[in-house]
Amino acid sequence: MKKGGGNGKRIIVGIDGGGTETLALAYDEGGRLVGEGIAGPSNPHNVGVDSAVENILSAMYNTGFKKADAVCVALAGMDTSKDISMMKSAIPKLSDHMVVEHDAFAALYAETRGAKGVLCIAGTGSIVLGYDGTERHRICDYGWLLGDDGSGYRIGCEGLRKAVKMLDGEMRRSILASYILDATFSDDLDALVSWGYSKQFRVDSIAALSKVVDRAAAEGDVAALKIINEASTSLARCAALMSRKIGVDRVYTVGGVFDSVLYHRIFKNYLSRSRISVVRSTKKTALGAVLVAADAVGLRLRPNRT
């Protein structure tokens, strides 16, 4: 483990701590990628603070650097200033210049480098973030209980609820119920309910069911189609509101839920009615974190790999 590159150049590290995995990228001040590390999820609200910190450190150390000249840790679940303060205190000092950020801001920063813009994340959770060049504004970012409109968790949860209603006779059974049973290794309603309330319950486990719902929707399942339509429309509505607030006609999207052809089409069509274009971000959130860290120490880094 080392600090600083072998050529004496400063090392800048950006860490993207999401609900599924944690990715760390290390660059030298010349813009060369010199290390990359991957670890488990690090949203403290989903996995707990201790596990989140453990995965952040693992990702950092896996880059080959124990410390760096500047570090930005961009985390999912940073819903309040209290969350950020909590994680700043919990994460060991990885640099004399360490910043803890919301992952959505880092993702937007990767695209705009501080210019105004709007970004939507739809992964395990969801957020619509707007930045006007001075202040940040957000919608939906209040966690799995109070927010996460249009997220993988919300889609998976609705799929699970619909499957329960089908299995207890409240709704006509469709292929969605069969897919949910298979995905949760459940033989019947009792087993499915037990799975949902098990001590091993994790938000990302529910979110993973969104792919099952999307599969059923792609095959024409009416209940699944309704879930996907309502989820995508809900997030698109928030994106349109934020775009008007910030004064932009482009929305960047990030997150695995947008891999759904149906979800993406509904989202894009909704915004097109307001003449707002949708651009799928191809830049890693961890890269945005690198840029935030670099700019924080006055280094205008130009990464040679985006």
Predicted regions located by residue number:
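Flexible, active-site-adjacent loop/turn segments at secondary-structure boundaries
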Residues: 76, 143-144, 195, 255
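Short acidic capping loops at alpha-helix termini that bridge into adjacent secondary structure
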Residues: 67-69, 96-97
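ATP-binding/phosphotransfer module of carbohydrate and carboxylate kinases, centering on a glycine-rich
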Residues: 1-68, 90, 111-116, 160-306
